[in-house]
């Protein structure tokens, strides 16, 4: 099972630093080092790996087939490369529909992990306005299978530009 919070993977370094500096906490410099170490433990250490997102989408597809879910979701079929962030945000919102419709613990865990991974990578992209992109509600409603296929296509657009 992957760690749900990849940015906490390197916290052991800060723990060792704290142990090393334990005798120096009585000084002002030691306290500053301790505080900075604690702050850095909470900062993101790695970017989301889009390949994990694709693997999670394939797992969701398999799980949905086993529970025979047939909802329709707003799906971006042919997103322009300049609209990929907007399209990704729509896909992430529609994942919540799958979550609500399935009421499956395994799907819940995978969607939470996938959302966290994707959002951590999206947060590193500049906040630029994507003009001319469709709103989520303007997209065509398609089956879950088509939704997941299009979602993988959008993720691959992010892989190809990184």
UniProtKB/Swiss-Prot annotation:
Disulfide bonds join 83-133, 90-136. Residues 1-29 form the signal peptide. It is found in: Secreted. It comes from the Eukaryota. Pfam families: IL15 (PF02372). InterPro entries: 4_helix_cytokine-like_core (IPR009079), IL-15 (IPR020439), IL-15/IL-21_fam (IPR003443), IL-15_mml (IPR020466). One of its GO terms (biological process) is positive regulation of immune response. One of its GO terms (cellular component) is extracellular space. GO terms for molecular function: cytokine activity; cytokine receptor binding. Keywords: Cytokine, Disulfide bond, Glycoprotein, Secreted, Signal. Glycans are attached at residues 113, 121, 127. SUPFAM superfamilies: 4-helical cytokines. Residues 30-48 form a propeptide. Belongs to the IL-15/IL-21 family. PANTHER family: INTERLEUKIN-15, INTERLEUKIN-15-RELATED. Cytokine that plays a major role in the development of inflammatory and protective immune responses to microbial invaders and parasites by modulating immune cells of both the innate and adaptive immune systems. Stimulates the proliferation of natural killer cells, T-cells and B-cells and promotes the secretion of several cytokines. In monocytes, induces the production of IL8 and monocyte chemotactic protein 1/CCL2, two chemokines that attract neutrophils and monocytes respectively to sites of infection. This is Interleukin-15. It comes from Bubalus bubalis (Domestic water buffalo). The lineage of its organism: Eukaryota, Metazoa, Chordata, Craniata, Vertebrata.
């Amino acid at each position: 099972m992957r760690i749900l919070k990849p940015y906490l993977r390197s916290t052991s370094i800060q723990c060792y630093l704290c142990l090393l500096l334990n005798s120096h906490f009585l000084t002002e410099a030691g306290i500053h080092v301790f505080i900075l170490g604690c702050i850095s433990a909470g900062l993101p250490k790695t970017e989301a790996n889009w390949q994990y997102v694709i693997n999670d989408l394939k797992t969701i597809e398999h799980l949905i087939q086993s529970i025979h879910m047939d909802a329709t979701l707003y799906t971006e079929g042919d997103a322009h490369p300049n609209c990929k962030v907007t399209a990704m945000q729509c896909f992430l919102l529609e994942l919540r529909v799958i979550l609500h419709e399935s009421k499956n613990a395994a799907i819940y865990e995978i969607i939470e992990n996938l959302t966290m991974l994707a959002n951590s990578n999206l947060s590193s992209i500049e906040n630029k306005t994507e003009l001319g992109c469709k709103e989520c509600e303007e997209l065509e409603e398609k089956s879950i299978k088509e939704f997941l296929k299009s979602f993988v296509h959008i993720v691959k657009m992010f892989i190809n530009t990184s």
